[in-house]
Regions:
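Solvent-exposed, charged helical/coil patches
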Residues: 1-38, 112-115
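Residue-level detector of family-conserved "landmark" positions at structurally sensitive sites
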Residues: 39-42, 91
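Basic, amphipathic alpha-helical patches used to engage nucleic acids or provide basic targeting signals
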Residues: 13-19, 46-111
């Protein structure tokens, strides 16, 4: 279980070293561009760090690479996020990179703000 300072330092490092998919999605989410939703990136929550968080509505968006295909860690993490009242949306890195606008539309639909 990481201490708070360690978690904050790790989140800062992750913001500096985003994956290409995270960078692409952040370009669509930042500054309320997506339906006025206010997202933050690499946010410590409990013992975890969420890729993107919008506190209203309570939604977490995760960009996943191949290492997430069958991760028990991700399942436990998602369960914790859900227990805290968050909706968890996961998208494959390849989908974010190849279809960024469709991914953004899917996020809007999931939170009830899309067509």
């Amino acid at each position: 279980m990481p201490d708070r300072k360690e978690l904050l330092d790790r989140a800062r490092a992750m913001r500096r070293e985003q994956t290409p998919a995270e960078r692409r999605l952040w370009g669509l989410l930042r500054g309320g561009q997506l339906g006025g939703l206010k997202f933050r990136r690499q946010v410590p929550l409990g013992d975890y760090i969420a890729d993107f968080v919008c506190f209203y509505p309570r939604v977490i968006v995760e960009c996943d690479g191949g290492q997430h295909a069958e991760s028990a860690y991700d399942a436990a993490r998602d369960a914790w996020f859900r227990a805290e009242g968050f909706q968890v949306l996961r998208y494959w890195n390849a989908d974010v990179l190849e279809h960024p606008h469709e991914t953004a539309e899917a996020i809007l639909r999931a939170v009830g703000r899309g067509p």
